[in-house]
Amino acid sequence: MRTRWRDHDWHLVHDAPQAPVLHMALDEALTDAVASGRRPPTLRIWEWAAPAVVIGRFQSLRNEVDMAAARRHGIEVVRRISGGGAMFIEPGNTITYSIYAPASLVEGLSFQESYALMDAWVLDALGELGIRAWYQPLNDIASDAGKIGGAAQTRRGGAVLHHVTMAYDIDAAKMLEVLRIGREKLSDKGTTSAAKRVDPLRSQTGLPREQVIERMLASFRRLHGLAGDRLRDGELAQARKLVRDKFGAAPWLADVP
């Protein structure tokens, strides 16, 4: 039977910055922990310890990323367990969160319907910030001024992982160096047009990143309830093992299933 948001006791994890590869592993570890009942349903706000490109589970590394440019800029390239497109991440310029929920929350819903459900609270928060934002199928959060963020989702073992990366600010020139975004189609104005396609929250709100996050959390708490929490030692240990055995290994990054 399908459950509702308020049927669950939601917990918040907002810890210190972590390495990009550890974030990938934490997503798997926490999804599995919720699936098994070892952890309550959780909202996790990510803090990044380093710049990164995160590619989707089914993307080709060669087609998506200029690895020479990534190395030149000191950007770590990692692969996540969910589908979707490549994300360009810089600490301080990005707001990323994951929701780890029992699969019952999205039972009977299509992926499109579940994206809309899982993004509704953040659209409410953006509205409180004066931004008219909407869900644009399949996985974008958009506004009149341009794209704000992108979502990805996977379902595994009785749980659903839904995560979103939103641009607080953006270095469009660097992004275009590292990501292969239709380079053959880009004119000399490519950087300008790419920047227009993404309209960051900083320019739309005028607020510091921390205040945007605080307003987001206030909306989630008001709508669904939210209790403070932290990563447990066992969860971190499991994530570090996943880094060694999977996410930090070359085959995972290079492999396309």
Question: Where would I find each of the regions flagged by the language model?
Answer:
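Active-site loop/lid in soluble adenylation, ligation, and acyl-transfer enzymes
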Residues: 1-68, 72, 80, 182, ...
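Catalytic beta-strand/loop module used to bind and position nucleotide/cofactor moieties
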Residues: 67, 87-222, 244-257
